[in-house]
Amino acid sequence: MSGAVCPGSFDPVTLGHVDIFERAAAQFDEVVVAVLVNPNKKGMFTLDERMEMIAESCAHLPNLRVESGQGLVVDFVRARGYSAIVKGLRSSTDFEYELQMAQMNKHVAGVDTFFIASAPSYSFVSSSLAKEVATLGGDVSALLPDAVNVRLQAKLRG
């Protein structure tokens, strides 16, 4: 059985993320979305909120589950008996960074990284950009799953 991990902070999950998850789920028997904790970052959404939003947005994917983790991604991957990481790429800038990480993960732990090119319609979408635009009153409904947009708007209203 093949399995892969899609790691990230997902604060919040975007339609671009969901597209990558769907495509990974079509290639692997099992996919774990790893919502990672970075103690140096203060997110807009709590860990539990981020996990719930991903689970809601991906309920149509029976071979996908959501877990939290901290520390090295390769340790998270190997603890589950997997040997693959899936990362989405929006641009050549993403590729430069992710290639370096992929090579390190292979060197340190023998874990392979599979890159999935972002759909052109999502190549500009990021969680931070969606939050920034929403904070300034812009419409981000085309960037986020509906339930996530509702939560973001509620969070901004206080």
Swiss-Prot record:
SUPFAM superfamilies, sorted: Nucleotidylyl transferase (SSF52374)
Superkingdom of the source species: Bacteria
Cofactors, names only: Mg(2+)
Record key words, sorted: ATP-binding, Coenzyme A biosynthesis, Cytoplasm, Magnesium, Nucleotide-binding, Nucleotidyltransferase, Transferase
Pfam family, one: CTP_transf_like
Keyword Membrane in annotation: no
One biological process term in Gene Ontology: coenzyme A biosynthetic process
Residues the record lists as binding substrate: S9, K41, V73, K87
Site (Transition state stabilizer): H17
GO cellular component term, pick one: cytoplasm
Enzyme class label: transferase
Positions bound to ATP: S9, F10, H17, G88, L89, R90, E98, Y122, S123, F124, V125, S126, S127, S128
Catalytic activity: (R)-4'-phosphopantetheine + ATP + H(+) = 3'-dephospho-CoA + diphosphate
Presence of the UniProt keyword Nucleotidyltransferase in the record: yes
Major site of localization recorded for this protein: cytoplasm
Molecular function in Gene Ontology: ATP binding; pantetheine-phosphate adenylyltransferase activity
EC number(s) from the headed UniProt entry: 2.7.7.3
Pathway: Cofactor biosynthesis; coenzyme A biosynthesis; CoA from (R)-pantothenate: step 4/5
InterPro entries attached to this UniProt entry: Cyt_trans-like, PPAT, Rossmann-like_a/b/a_fold
Record localization: Cytoplasm
Subunit structure comment from the entry: Homohexamer.
Family: Belongs to the bacterial CoaD family.
Primary role: Reversibly transfers an adenylyl group from ATP to 4'-phosphopantetheine, yielding dephospho-CoA (dPCoA) and pyrophosphate.
Protein name: Phosphopantetheine adenylyltransferase
Organism expressing this protein natively: Mycobacterium sp. (strain KMS)
